[in-house]
Structures are given as structure tokens and as C-alpha cells.
Amino acid sequence: YESMHKLPDVKWDLIIADEAHGMGAFPKPSKRAKDFRALVSKTKARVILLSGTPTPESYSQMYHQVYALPSGPFHKYKNFYGFANDNVDVKLKRIGGHSIKDYTAGQSKILADMAPYTISYTQEEAGFVVETTEKVLEVELLPVTYEIMRKLRKDLVVEGKEEVILADTAVKLMIKMHQLCSGTIKFESGNSKVIDYTKAQFIKETFKGKRIGIFYKFKQELHALKSVFGDALTESLDEFNAGGQVIALQIVSGREGISLQKAEALVYYNIDFSATSYWQSKDRMTTKDRLKNDVYWIFAKGGIERDIYKAVTKKKDYTLNHFKRDLLNLF
């Protein structure tokens, strides 16, 4: 999608857009959605949209996926806000002392309106019979890591000899805790560091001899993996497919458009707040010939990851409200 501007100046008869849910941002259309709309308008092409998860977090995500279509189900609406007046239960949400409109409660009639335009297949109907097994494995982090997290929760600041960890807002506290539960931290200065290699070492020992794909969240987690695995780890899909033992991919960038069919298992160093990331990334090994997928989640004992997991498996993003509720029960 980011390379649409490089397409040759051809009057296409048909455009097929894969992973169409990537255009579903709202209330404002994303650059991806606007560029796609311009392409359709220019070429007057027919369009086929493909997605395994068209509305992973909200039915409201449907509008900008189809707003490029001049005869689509919602073409009568000038913009998302007009669409929302008829199709969304708009609520007010308090954030930072301000009230903002929340458009996530799209009504089920959105899907009903889409039905005449939609062909739906389950994986089984499409010939995929894979059984996915997920296992959560907990590790005990270093005592100093838990000490830092407890102090940060209590004081909202941890001062070292050279660096400071500051969590002066609820959002920053959530992100810092998320980082620390996998043994990394980004300091107030902007510098980052691995302070605990426990997860990386556990993965190396537990999956020794297996070809695995590892999903990580933060950049320093990749640094930890490189330090522990050395030359056995690659970030190149071509190298992995050619016989590589371990591939590491960032969750968001690796959740779509790639196949890890050569992997024996998927291992998650960390977990993303996004339900889309959960449902998309864990399906990267699936092929028609494969009968079983093994997926492993590596969580810190007493950490935030299990609470995130509970949310995203129910197709809900993990939010600040979840974190405020869960904070007192951590470690």
C-alpha cells in the first residue's frame, strides 16, 4: 500500500486489495485509505477486497475499507461522521480531563448492510484444517527487575546513576511496565537498554534444536535476542526459508503478508496491545498442507502480559482502563 504511488499509469480493469482491514482506521481516513480511494477514482476499476479479519476491533472499521467504492453500501454518506450518525452508538470518553467522542461501538447492522457485497469462508471451508495450540510459559525475571517495577509503581520514578525512568502519566507507566516485563526499558533521556535477558535465555534453552519464529514488541527485545542467539538468528525471511534456525520479527510489521510455514513453532517474546496483532500474527504458519500450529507465549511471572492476553483473545484491545484495573495485582 505504501508503494501505490509507484504503480504504472495503467487503467486497471480490476484491483484486488489484500489485508483490506489495514484501511479501516476511523474517524479520519488513513493515508492508505485515501491513496486507495484516489487510485480507484482514477482508474474506475472494479474492486475485490480481501481480509481474514475485516473488523477485528470494531464494526466501525468497515467504513473506510469500502469508502473508495462509488456504489458501495455506504456511498450515500459524505464522510465517516455522517455514517456514524446512523450506524454507531457514539459515546463520550474522558481522557486527560477532556471529553472526546468514542466511535468504536459500531452497530451490527453494518455487517448486515455489507452482506450483499460479501462472500465469507471459514478456514475449514477454504481447505485449511490446521489445529492451533497455544501455550503460556511463565519465567521468573531477575529480582532487580521486579524491584524496579515495584518502585516505579509506588513512586512513578526510578533514578539511577546516569539514567531516570519516569512514569509521570498513566500511559507512560503502562508502557514502562510493558517494557520491563520483558526485561527492557526506555529511559527519560531517550536511551534504551536491556536490563534482563531471562526471556531470551529461556527461549534459547527451551526451543533448542527447533526452527522457530520469534515475535518481539520493542527494539531492545531484538537486541536481547541477538545477544543470546548470535549468528543463529536472522531477520531475513529468505535466509530463514533457506535453512535458518531462528527468525525474529517485530509483531506489527510481521503480522501480515508473510508466511512462516518453515517454522516448527511460533514464540512470542512479548505481546502487543492490539487484538489485530494477536489474531493476525499467530496465523503466520498456516498453510493448506499443515495440520498443527504450535504457538508459545513467554510471560513474566506476575507481569502484565497475561492480562493483555485475556483482552486480545476476546478481540478487545488492551487499553489504559484495563491497565488501571490490573496494576494493583501485578507482581
Regions from the PLM with identified roles:
Residues S3-K6, S58-H64, I148, E221-L225, ...:
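Phosphate- and divalent-cation-binding pockets in alpha/beta enzyme and binding domains
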Residues K11, F128-Q261, A265, F323-F331:
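Conserved Helicase C-terminal RecA-like lobe
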